[in-house]
């Protein structure tokens, strides 16, 4: 008698993806972030759905509806803060996941990597639009500043901005379309995640050694299902602690003031997870140059497979490249800090130096160090 798990047309797909999937026996905790991102996405869709039941996408009532959710809806405060801090967790895991991919050379799976970059853009767009919805001061001014950047595009820029706004400023039309897009994008992201996994399962997972692991594979269940559940447990402990004790730790106090087009906040800044890109944007005095640098700071990820010049895939056995990798991490932390600081001396100079180092490390230092390590291997 055939096993239903292996013969049923639908269950068979789940079986090949999560149960009988041959997985390298030596993948570390750095491989947990994929499943954690999946859990985060599910959590965001669920909490977002309940928030959408009470939220009103209108400039006059949006702020009040969020207040109503927190005060009057049963456990509304919990749903709202789980959603807001869940986004922060999402980005923490995203950055760890990308960092893992860079460190262990997972970007050599070109299809999986490129879909991943598109996913990153989609998640960033979703998070940005979600930040606009509470219609606080930082929501309004953040939306105004970031959408205005598109006006730097030659010839079509100003028209494009007005087209996105649905008028001559960020107003009711903007809020309505941002809510519609914020609602639909997570489902598009879910479809993209499936494509991401489809491409991954074509090649199989990478592993810390960066070598072919076909000779040493184990089934995904029970070994990695248990490991993933442990990761989810740690994530839920962290997230619930954040929500229960310091729900506003990662937010901006300005967003507790209703949006006022006549009053500009002293320091306009996005959520913490965009600060590194915001710092790169601000470090260039020219508007178009800043926008290009901002776009390229993320698009540079597409160059990793092209710039890979080492004979080894992973950085596990390459100490010099490891130093550069951690230098890049430190550099991104500095950029994140700078993005949250006012535009004044010495922050301007630090931001410019950190932005320059970011591009220099990825484009020149990392490939040349890899070539040097190839030479050292021959000695």
UniProtKB/Swiss-Prot annotation:
Subcellular location: Mitochondrion inner membrane
Residues binding heme b b562, per UniProt: 83, 182
Keyword Heme: yes
Recorded GO MF terms: metal ion binding; ubiquinol-cytochrome-c reductase activity
Single Gene Ontology BP annotation: mitochondrial electron transport, ubiquinol to cytochrome c
Needed cofactors: heme b
Binding site for a ubiquinone: 201
Species of the source: Ctenomys steinbachi (Steinbach's tuco-tuco)
Binding residue positions for heme b b566: 97, 196
Coiled-coil boundaries: none
Subunit structure: The cytochrome bc1 complex contains 11 subunits: 3 respiratory subunits (MT-CYB, CYC1 and UQCRFS1), 2 core proteins (UQCRC1 and UQCRC2) and 6 low-molecular weight proteins (UQCRH/QCR6, UQCRB/QCR7, UQCRQ/QCR8, UQCR10/QCR9, UQCR11/QCR10 and a cleavage product of UQCRFS1). This cytochrome bc1 complex then forms a dimer.
Keywords tagged on the record: Electron transport, Heme, Iron, Membrane, Metal-binding, Mitochondrion, Mitochondrion inner membrane, Respiratory chain, Transmembrane, Transmembrane helix, Transport, Ubiquinone
Any Pfam family matching the protein: Cytochrome_B
Top-level taxon: Eukaryota
Cofactor binding description: Binds 2 heme b groups non-covalently.
Residues annotated as transmembrane: 33-53, 77-98, 113-133, 178-198, 226-246, 288-308, 320-340, 347-367
Further details from the record: Heme 1 (or BL or b562) is low-potential and absorbs at about 562 nm, and heme 2 (or BH or b566) is high-potential and absorbs at about 566 nm.
Entry membrane topology: Multi-pass membrane protein
GO CC annotation, single: respiratory chain complex III
Taxonomic lineage of the native organism: Eukaryota, Metazoa, Chordata, Craniata, Vertebrata
Family in the record: Belongs to the cytochrome b family.
Functional note: Component of the ubiquinol-cytochrome c reductase complex (complex III or cytochrome b-c1 complex) that is part of the mitochondrial respiratory chain. The b-c1 complex mediates electron transfer from ubiquinol to cytochrome c. Contributes to the generation of a proton gradient across the mitochondrial membrane that is then used for ATP synthesis.
Name of this chain's protein: Cytochrome b
């Amino acid at each position: 008698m055939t096993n239903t798990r292996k013969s049923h047309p639908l269950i068979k797909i789940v079986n090949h993806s999560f149960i009988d999937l041959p997985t390298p026996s030596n993948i570390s905790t750095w491989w947990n972030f994929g499943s954690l991102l999946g859990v985060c996405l599910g959590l965001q869709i669920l909490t977002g759905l309940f928030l959408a039941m009470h939220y009103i996408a209108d400039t006059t009532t949006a702020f009040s509806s969020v207040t109503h959710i927190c005060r009057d809806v049963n456990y509304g405060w919990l749903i709202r803060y789980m959603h807001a801090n869940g986004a922060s967790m999402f980005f923490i895991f995203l950055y760890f996941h990308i960092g893992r991919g860079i460190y262990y050379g997972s970007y050599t799976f070109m299809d999986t990597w490129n879909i991943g970059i598109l996913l990153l853009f989609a998640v960033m767009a979703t998070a940005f639009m979600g930040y606009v919805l509470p219609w606080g001061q930082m929501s309004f001014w953040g939306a105004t500043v970031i959408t205005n950047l598109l006006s730097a595009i030659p010839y079509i820029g100003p028209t494009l901005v007005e087209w996105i706004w649905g008028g001559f400023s960020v107003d009711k039309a903007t809020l309505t379309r941002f809510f519609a897009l914020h609602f639909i994008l997570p489902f598009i992201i879910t479809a993209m995640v499936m494509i991401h996994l489809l491409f991954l399962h074509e090649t199989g997972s990478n592993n810390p050694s960066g070598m072919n692991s076909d000779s040493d594979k184990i089934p995904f269940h029970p070994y990695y299902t248990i490991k993933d559940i442990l990761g989810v447990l740690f994530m839920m402990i962290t997230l619930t602690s954040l929500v229960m004790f310091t729900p506003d730790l990662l937010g901006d106090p300005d967003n507790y003031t209703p949006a006022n087009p006549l009053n500009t906040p002293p320091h306009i800044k996005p959520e913490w997870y965009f600060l590194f890109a915001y710092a790169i944007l601000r470090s260039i005095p020219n508007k178009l140059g800043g926008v290009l640098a901002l776009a390229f700071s993320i698009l540079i990820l597409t160059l990793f497979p092209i710039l890979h010049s080492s004979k080894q895939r992973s950085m596990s056995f390459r100490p010099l490249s490891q130093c550069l990798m951690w230098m890049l991490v430190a550099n991104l932390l500095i950029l994140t800090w700078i993005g949250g600081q006012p535009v004044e001396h010495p922050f301007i100079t630090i931001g410019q130096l950190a932005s320059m180092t970011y591009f220099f490390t990825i484009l020149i230092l990392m490939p040349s160090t890899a070539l040097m390590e190839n030479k050292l291997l021959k000695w």
